[in-house]
């Protein structure tokens, strides 16, 4: 969709899809009157500048100043934006003037006058200087624009904003600099705001379903080969076979509610190691999220939603200026949601608010303050899962229904709350150096009272273990960096030098109640009410549990240089991290058959770890849009486990080789990418087979594969995303052996032990494919109506470390529609209806299994909303 510039009844639009994200300034009604243009000339593009024209130069110095430019032949509007970026020149022209026109190529060192004359050669257009603006007109028209008053600064697409349609061309993910994706030598994928609007994901996992290299439905899995065995923010997604970490505005988050989609402008996926810029990260990559912040143009939107399972939702998102000049702006996003789920007695309830304010202190200094609060008394997840006999394998009475709840309605509490404060500060000292800083404080708490599944007694009955958990955490993080540019002859440098720290404190308590026979339930005909919780560590209660208190401080220093010589871009970076686990106290309370209770308290020694990570890559941009690249990068994750002798483990260390292609198809807004990679990770941990209370270093995991993707605004009313991923993740070096699991034997898991070496990592699909399209037909009879749909395929996954059984593959279909009321009735401008249906056929499928349970995928979900923008 085109962003809009407010005028007297006419939209100011950019023609090229690359420019649709240009933030349009407000043009007052007096401007339109002063221009005296017809309605056909009311659409204006203004590109910032400082230069002169052929007719009335501002100054001799400005006219004669020379610039080195290299702009290939392309759409005229794109060439003008490139010239503006290269020279700092401000251009004003009506979009009708550039429609269908192509520019001539320019290359060399020349003045703005010479560059404009060459670009416009053969287009039938000329230019003249009007005040401080270069105005384009038809050579024969002699149309003269009056003074242009612009309320705001027009710039190209924001590197942290919502993107344009399904495509984003610029990003800060992976480099912390505003860089075109086609100049970064590694895999980065952007989920734009429009894609989220069309697909209606309720959380980040659902938003990631169409992203290459990401398995977003691995709920409830525990990956032995995954790099991150810490809190993964309630998510079950994997990147290139490794569990992932989430970052908000560049800082790692441990929030249990991270990534409320109603609060996000975009989601950025960096596949591959990213430790150089972000510290502790898995070799699979990171998930970056950008919170909504005040916009330069007013924004007002509200919506009400509905859906199956009793869903009702309301959201609001408003942004406007506070001061008359607009140097102080605010934004407020809020959500209220209540609904059931496909499983009885499992509900989702949430209220949240995200206020923010931006103060442009002066032309060089800006400060943004954000705060958020999310209260989720029911998080809608059913982590208990179901037995494999009755889901993965045919049961005596068929499959267990998705609606089946195997817990107790009176012992069923899953919820969390999170509070956060953040500020982002920037100051530009001069054209060479600027300073950027991000700070966040967040506090999160999660509670869980459920019954987890234990042994399956027979074909119909299974034993449950009552469980209660309480996790609270507090995180303080800051990232401060100097960013700058300089040239060494024909070579340009875009450098970053920075430091960040993160202080994380967590307290985790848990208790199991081994009640016995009263906790057994029939999986096909559950009867509730037979269980009464008994917790207290007394001889009357058969409970076992403990508490852990953990504190970590991490600090890192990093540097990066993006070197560019003509069409060649080279990326070099390095980082050193120091990690201190300053406090690790564990208290274990357990059963004793003699006196009924025993208590064990232990205080673990603190540990210090450090690691150096680095990366290097290069990418070459051919003039016809192709950009091949190669990169090498490393990662690390500090580990908190201890072996049976009380010794700490080495950090998880990973490295990746990646080779790929990026192709921006000329004359289109279509970005195609392909990447092949090889990742290895050392020192992953498993439970010590000789002492199950401790961990053991299992060895090395290798993941290799390739990804292809497309993000495309094919034409004005047709957008698409598509991807294919192949992942081969294996245990390549290990001394660990595991039993062959026999899911038919109910309690029998005593098969012969075999080595895990060479086996596939469990719950990692080798093949994934997806495609999603949205189309609004231009026909008058269907004016305002749009349709969309998608296909998702996930290959089979092995369910244990020795690959003795597997969960089958599945194919899902999603469809949707939307209607713009204003397209047919002008009085209803801004009113829009939306419908999104996932898993259209209501397919029964399994996302993953382990040796104790399987997890069912979501059935048919129907979401709709009505939104109004004003």
Q: Which role does the model predict for each range below?
A:
Residues 236, 377-389, 503-508, 619-663, ...:
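Surface-exposed extracellular loop regions of Gram-negative outer-membrane beta-barrel proteins
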Residues 263-265, 276-355, 361-365, 419, ...:
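Outer-membrane beta-barrel translocator/receptor signature
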Residues 567, 678, 697-800, 844:
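Gram-negative outer-membrane beta-barrel transporters
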Residues 494-495, 657, 759-870:
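Conserved C-terminal beta-signal and adjacent last beta-strands/turns
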